[in-house]
């Protein structure tokens, strides 16, 4: 963005290689993860596990991310960013191998938590790497492009699963290949100079609290985005099955949500940079996208009897939810660098993950027991609270 500090080490040799390696490694790793996630849910349903229990398994991924994220800046401070990224790529591969070699649900639960820990580390570091490597004046563009690519992985993973078939013996091998390729590309990330604030940045729980207090509305936007983009996406296969869709169509709901994220993230990031006041522009766009979520979610009251409504609804959830996260990350990238950037990114990921954890943890039971009342009520409440808070903040800023 135009307000990005020019002192950032983006002109250092290897910054282009850094951007490329982070983009490509994340593309392959997340494609594997988002192919694996619906595959696990469908395997659980095939084993006649209840929808409520399957939803709790989906929530365990977010629980792992939620537990690890507060400590991401501490781990990074101790190990360094490259070593931590390498660790975060190895752990999901080990977890995937475990899923395919055992049928013990207790082991699966432990592996899901471990993979969640790794996802939390990589998530924070990948976002911070993009902001660190981006050329001055183009941070919004690159963060938007990265978010678009992440949305693309939502499409690639489930689409591969639907194409190969959830019951195919080839599906596990494709997952392993994707994760292994992502691990190999992570090794290409170049070294960075030492962080200028290694000894002064607030890290850990103290740093997280400071970031939340300083920018509460940005973090609330992250929560709403996480609820509708990632949290609900994790239970969309269950939602589709409950609505009477087939297994492949239910898995494709995740692709539709991801397609929405893919199409909107980059334009939202570029548009945010065009306002005379970028900060006010970001808040305006956040308010508009949250209002769109609220409008689309009203369709959940009728989707049980008009199942075609689920397709545009989940597309808007993915598009607007992803845009909220992208705009919040651009806001952080405009203000922070070094370990402070890692820490503030961790806070955004934490609130985003909390939104995902709430959505996946509660929605499974609500879909199973109160599809037409409880699930819509929860979703509408979250959207309404987010919109009210953003409207209040925007009006205060306009005065």
Language-model regions: role of each:
Residues 121-134, 322-336:
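Intracellular juxtamembrane helix-capping segments at the cytosolic ends
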Residues 113-148:
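Cytoplasmic helix-loop-helix junction between adjacent transmembrane helices
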Residues 280-325:
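C-terminal transmembrane helical hairpin of 12-TM major facilitator-type secondary transporters
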Residues 172-188, 376-391:
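Symmetry-related core transmembrane helices of the 12-TM Major Facilitator Superfamily/SLC fold
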Residues 12-62, 215-222, 229-243, 250:
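Helix-loop boundary and gating motifs at the non-cytosolic
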Residues 83-97, 283-298, 380:
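Structural signature of the two symmetry-related core transmembrane helices
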Residues 339-368:
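A late C-terminal transmembrane helix in Major Facilitator Superfamily
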Residues 68-80, 165, 264-280, 367-368:
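Helix-to-loop junctions at the C-terminal end of transmembrane segments
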């Amino acid at each position: 963005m135009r307000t990005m500090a020019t002192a950032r080490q983006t002109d250092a040799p290897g910054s282009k290689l850094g951007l490329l390696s982070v983009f490509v490694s994340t593309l392959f790793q997340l494609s594997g993860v988002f192919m694996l996630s619906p595959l696990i849910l469908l395997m659980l349903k095939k084993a006649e596990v209840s929808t409520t229990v399957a939803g709790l398994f989906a929530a365990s991924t977010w629980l792992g991310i939620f537990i690890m994220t507060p400590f991401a800046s501490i781990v990074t401070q101790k190990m360094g960013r490259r070593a931590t990224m390498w660790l975060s790529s190895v752990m999901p591969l080990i977890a995937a191998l475990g899923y395919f070699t055992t049928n013990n649900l207790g082991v699966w639960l432990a592996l899901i938590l471990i993979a969640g820990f790794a996802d939390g580390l990589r998530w924070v570091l990948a976002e911070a790497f993009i902001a660190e490597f981006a050329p001055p004046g183009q941070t919004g563009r690159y963060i938007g492009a990265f978010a678009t690519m992440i949305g693309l992985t939502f499409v690639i993973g489930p689409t591969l699963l639907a194409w190969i078939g959830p019951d195919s013996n080839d599906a596990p091998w494709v997952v392993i290949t994707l994760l292994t390729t992502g691990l190999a590309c992570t090794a290409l990330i170049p070294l960075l100079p030492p962080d200028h604030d290694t000894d002064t940045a607030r890290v850990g729980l103290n740093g997280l609290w400071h970031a939340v207090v300083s920018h509460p509305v940005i973090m609330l936007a992250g929560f709403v985005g996480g609820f509708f983009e990632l949290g609900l996406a994790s239970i969309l296969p269950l939602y589709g099955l409950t609505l009477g869709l087939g297994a492949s169509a239910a898995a494709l709901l995740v692709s539709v949500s991801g397609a929405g994220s893919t199409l909107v993230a980059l334009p939202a990031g570029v548009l945010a940079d065009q306002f005379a006041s970028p900060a006010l522009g970001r808040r305006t766009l956040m308010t508009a996208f949250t209002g769109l979520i609220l409008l689309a979610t009203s369709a959940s009251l009728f989707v049980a009897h008009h199942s075609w409504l689920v397709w545009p609804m989940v597309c808007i959830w993915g598009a607007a939810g992803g845009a909220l996260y992208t705009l919040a990350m651009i806001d952080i990238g405009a203000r922070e660098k070094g370990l402070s950037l890692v820490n503030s990114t961790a806070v955004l990921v934490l609130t985003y993950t909390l939104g995902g954890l709430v959505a996946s943890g509660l929605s499974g039971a609500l879909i199973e027991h109160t599809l037409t009342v409880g699930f819509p009520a929860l979703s509408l409440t979250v959207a309404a609270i987010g919109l009210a808070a953003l409207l209040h903040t925007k009006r205060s800023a306009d005065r």
